[in-house]
Amino acid sequence: MPDGAPQELLEAQLTTRADGITILELAGEVDMSSAQILVDQFVAISGQRLDNVILDATRVTFIDSTGLHALTEGKRKIHEQGTRIFLVPSPQVRRVLELVFPEPLFAARVDSVEEALSQIQLQTTGDR
């Protein structure tokens, strides 16, 4: 990247909705220089013992092997606590995941945050 060219950094925002559903929104590049941001977010999530988390990666433009490692380790850590993770990938993230992991890494991979919310609602209604 030439000097002076802006580098696309990873932005992460963790929010909990009024209904208790937590959404981690990611935007930018998940690579060697930014993967720790993702790891830190997963640590914050794992400390909360949540039922469901939506990982909104629709604005992730690039992910490398370091980012994939952070994603898989974070998913493992959260999943071990019984938290269900809904991944909403960008086309770039979806393609890399499909190439690297022939079997789906995330059982709940959806096309939109709205679809994830709908599935959580159905799951919650079905548990009653």
Which residue ranges define each predicted feature?
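Conserved TIR/SEFIR loop-to-helix hotspot centered on a Trp-containing motif
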Residues: I63
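STAS-like cytosolic regulatory interaction modules
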Residues: M1-V60, R76-R128
